Amino acid sequence: MGPHPAVAAIRLAVRRVLHDILIEHAPGSADLPRDVPHDLPPPPLVLVACSGGADSMALASALAFEAPKLGIRAGGITVDHGLQSGSDLRADEVVGRLVDLGLTPTESIAVTVGRDGGPEAAARDARYAALDAAARRHGACAVLLGHTRDDQAETVLLGLARGSGIRSLSGMAAVSGTGGRYRRPFLQLDRQTARKACMAQSLPVWDDPHNADPAYTRSRLRHEGLPALEKALGKGVVEALARTAQLSRDDADALDVWAGQAEASVRDAAGLLECAKLYALPPAVRRRILRRAAIEAGAPAGSLFARHIEEVDRLITGWRGQGAINLPGKVVAQRQGGRLVIRQG
């Protein structure tokens, strides 16, 4: 008798991702002559980020099951945000569960959560910084994240509410981070599948009270917004939003390529952006070039919003002699003699 359908589903999702990782990190010894001695590198290490919740515990269990069969080392990391009383003890419990699954290395990392961008964004920034550092420290080639299709739907709605562009509507990528470090195997699986997999394997899970706290935007969306949409529109809203994310990502990727190819054609010999040539481009392509130029000048990508780029765009499409535009990171955009100059102020 095979595993529970939910367990089979999570294992298959992880197996596919691990196969991709193996292909990407295969040792380059195949081209060496057989009579030339050479040392093979150690098997790749894949870490799972685990909060102890159902999604990440299911992911950890699937990684622990699949990795040895593929000759991959598997470890686990939990991040203690220190936002709740006893969080350090819970983090230690999670590490114990990861050890019980057979994962090694395992580690609990305590972080200090700042205030920039609100509590959710600050916690996310601290968490990813800790995971990046852990991956470098342990020499991991990838870190698995337990985001599900439900998380993807929530992300799309949050982007829509902010009035963001198509890139925000594309949600979370299956592969992201420097060098493709972060992998999200569960983006095609719903949250209930992960929870059922934990139940079928008798895995203890921890339900973070913050996930039910209406003080947090994502929590309100999860417990009030999405149920209201499904009540008004019928079942299938989550699936439709996740599908929208993928279609939007395909379009956004194509526009990014177009913008990258067009950028060289709108710069003069000195590398400055020519306003007349920018004006001739489609708005979606032009704004991507402007955003890229602002980031290259030092504007933090996470603080550079659509409204900032729209203001810079008006220097090209609605020129009336207006002054310089101040952007995040002390970057200034200014039109000078038919050229657009974006630089540190």
From Swiss-Prot:
Keyword Nucleotide-binding: yes
Matches recorded under PANTHER family: TRNA(ILE)-LYSIDINE SYNTHASE-RELATED
EC number, as in UniProt: 6.3.4.19
An example Gene Ontology biological process: tRNA modification
Keyword vocabulary terms for this entry: ATP-binding, Cytoplasm, Ligase, Nucleotide-binding, tRNA processing
Gene Ontology molecular functions: ATP binding; tRNA(Ile)-lysidine synthase activity
Pfam families in UniProt: ATP_bind_3, TilS
Top-level enzyme category: ligase
Lineage: Bacteria, Bacillati, Actinomycetota, Actinomycetes, Kitasatosporales
UniProt KW Cell inner membrane keyword: no
Biological function: Ligates lysine onto the cytidine present at position 34 of the AUA codon-specific tRNA(Ile) that contains the anticodon CAU, in an ATP-dependent manner. Cytidine is converted to lysidine, thus changing the amino acid specificity of the tRNA from methionine to isoleucine.
Primary location class: cytoplasm
InterPro entries, A to Z: Rossmann-like_a/b/a_fold, TilS/TtcA_N, tRNA_Ile_lys_synt, tRNA_Ile_lys_synt_N, tRNA_Ile_lys_synt_subst-bd
Gene name in the database record: tilS
Membership in a protein family: Belongs to the tRNA(Ile)-lysidine synthase family.
Protein name: tRNA(Ile)-lysidine synthase
Compartments, as annotated in UniProt: Cytoplasm
Domain notes: The N-terminal region contains the highly conserved SGGXDS motif, predicted to be a P-loop motif involved in ATP binding.
